[in-house]
């Protein structure tokens, strides 16, 4: 029995019956396009993920799109199941509209360009959610009521002379190391080392043009514009936030040194197109035993608890790198940065999306 030709005929028939793909006849206009991929290894490897951030910008409109996926065995399942598919927002100053798109569900919300009013109850709920999330992040396992302070802080930045092309950008390499010495009242010491592998490119005219368009949009948007992550900095704000959150024993007055770390990288010339950061800790200040492990009950009361109890064995089996792993790894890579023709349809709600507010 010749089954394969029958399948081929059936497939051809289905293809013939399928609705033809809509042709996009909207005009093309110059648009700033900025695309960045951020790979976050997570604190101690927990819940590693990758997010693609893309912006299309004109003087009176902007589309921002985020696609999130887990990169570890466990986080791949969790992130893709809960937040997979990505989301986007379209701001149209010419129409005073803000559309929020859920790309997987094909749904959207509509608000004025500066956003819908947020009820006080919703603000309180969001704050509680952020606080709960902060509690779940891994932290140092240290002695109770023990504090550490910074005894020395040293930066070393070096151009290596190495050059290569990264996503079409002619890039030059810098390496840097930031070494912090932390001590407790018993004179026990921990050494914190943040290493940087940074590739930069001269700020060429296409890049300047893209930034100029974005600045023009922000000026038109007004003071209420909420800035996104600044990917022009070699030291991303997320890294210092995660470091500060993990170092639970560090005195509050010393945390400012973490927040100001990026200023020490001012010797680096050019625009970063690739940055890889690793953070290592070594020592026993405050009896440091590494990341705090969240205990799970034998009968989890939530999906999060059940998934969390599964995470440990999955990570140990499939995600533990050879050698001492870093507490944190973080990579930022620029994929696109310039002005190019883009269809007007990018700034409209796609056909078939359902309004849900």
What are these regions (language model features)?
Residues 1-8:
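Bacterial N-terminal signal peptides that target proteins for export
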Residues 23-357:
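Extended soluble regions of mature proteins
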